[in-house]
């Protein structure tokens, strides 16, 4: 049986709709009928066929890793799932054998394989993944929100790396993950949450999500904003989401002594760091990759169930046949999360 999919078919710019074989269900797998998928910044990198994509992505391959769907097939060894369960899933498939996997630190597996990056993705009518990677979506959480649990998890993992209650938080990079991290920080009790970017559309989106201040650093000085807020000592927690060297440099300068920084954005390997800021301020810097399995997933569901509203981050919906419009709007920068409807 052939099914519809969105694939990287050629080593050049673009994503194409094609037909692929129905995936085969293994003993430990679930077969998921896809309802909705969301376009990730990673998918845009793959579309653009940048240097990272050229080194990483096998061609041809079905792409995508943000989704919600319904369980329609269950491998014979699988327990804990039923036909009809609504699921999303962890996009990092881990080995189960390395020291970190065996120690319960699965998100630090050294042999991680990415859905839609190293193996067949979810931009397809059906997806097969290990049942271990599936997460049942609680009733009361919409399909739209469930489809963005993967990037929401990046935001939650990063934001909750440190205690935020009563703290002043700086977030550099107002992409969807940065904005969701800001909403999480406010929800769990941070005092001032300041987010910086140069994209006015996304700064407006951050304002709608409740940040204290959204600062266009091309037009406004971060130190001036801190004075206006009555901040005399610097930020307690920094969440770096942009990968932009100048943003990280500004963060280091404005951190309080003893401040803590979580890094999710991927800067160029040649990025220079003012180590005086790190050493003499006693800063703690932590790298973040993916989501904790599955603690972050339970926290995501609980945050939404306790009243966190991240729905404004979803700005566009398209039928899957109009996927090109979705990629165009994502590439323009004038969007939050873009959802493709497969049904």
Curated annotation (Swiss-Prot):
EC main group: oxidoreductase
Gene Ontology CC terms = cytoplasm
User: Which UniProt key words apply to this protein?
Assistant: Cytoplasm, Metal-binding, NAD, Oxidoreductase, Zinc
The record's listing under InterPro entries reads:
ADH-like_C, ADH-like_N, ADH_Zn_CS, GroES-like_sf, L-Threonine_3-DHase, NAD(P)-bd_dom_sf, PKS_ER, Zn_alcohol_dh
The cofactor binding remark recorded in the entry reads: Binds 2 Zn(2+) ions per subunit.
Q: Which residues are recorded as binding Zn(2+) 2?
A: 95, 98, 101, 109
GO MF annotation terms: L-threonine 3-dehydrogenase activity; zinc ion binding
* Catalysis performed (reactions): L-threonine + NAD(+) = (2S)-2-amino-3-oxobutanoate + NADH + H(+)
Active site positions, chain numbering: 42, 45
What coarse category fits the chief subcellular location reported for this protein? cytoplasm
Residues involved in NAD(+) binding: 177, 197, 202, 264-266, 288-289
Q: Which GO terms describe its biological process?
A: L-threonine catabolic process to glycine
Name of the protein this chain belongs to: L-threonine 3-dehydrogenase
């Amino acid at each position: 049986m052939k099914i519809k999919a969105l694939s990287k078919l050629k080593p050049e710019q673009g994503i194409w709709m094609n037909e692929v074989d129905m995936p085969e269900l293994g003993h430990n797998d679930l077969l998921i009928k896809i309802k909705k998928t969301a376009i990730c910044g990673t998918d845009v990198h793959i579309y653009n066929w940048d240097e990272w994509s050229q080194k990483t992505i096998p061609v041809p391959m079905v792409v995508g890793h943000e989704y919600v769907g319904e369980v329609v097939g269950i491998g014979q060894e699988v327990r804990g799932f039923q036909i009809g369960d609504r699921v999303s899933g962890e996009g990092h498939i881990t080995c189960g054998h390395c020291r970190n996997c065996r120690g319960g630190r699965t998100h630090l597996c050294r042999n991680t394989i990415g859905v839609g990056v190293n193996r067949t993705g979810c931009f397809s009518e059906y997806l097969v993944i290990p049942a271990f990677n599936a997460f049942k979506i609680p009733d009361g959480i919409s399909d739209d929100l469930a489809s963005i649990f993967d990037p929401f998890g990046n935001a939650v993992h990063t934001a909750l790396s440190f205690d935020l209650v009563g703290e002043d938080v700086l977030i550099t990079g107002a992409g969807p993950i940065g904005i969701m991290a800001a909403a999480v920080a406010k929800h769990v009790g941070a005092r001032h949450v300041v987010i910086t970017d140069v994209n006015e559309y996304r700064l407006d989106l951050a304002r709608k999500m409740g940040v204290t201040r959204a600062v266009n650093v091309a037009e406004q000085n971060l130190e001036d904003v801190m004075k206006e807020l009555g901040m005399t000592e610097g930020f307690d927690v920094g969440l770096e989401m942009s990968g932009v060297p100048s943003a990280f440099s500004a963060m280091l300068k404005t951190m309080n002594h003893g401040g803590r920084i979580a890094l999710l954005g991927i800067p160029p390997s040649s990025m220079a760091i003012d180590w005086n800021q790190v050493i003499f301020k006693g800063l703690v810097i932590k790298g973040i990759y993916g989501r904790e399995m599955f603690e972050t997933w339970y926290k995501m569901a609980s945050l939404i169930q306790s009243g966190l509203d991240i729905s404004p981050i979803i700005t566009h919906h398209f039928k899957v046949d109009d996927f090109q419009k979705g990629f165009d709007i994502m590439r323009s920068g004038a969007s939050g999360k873009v959802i493709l409807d497969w049904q």
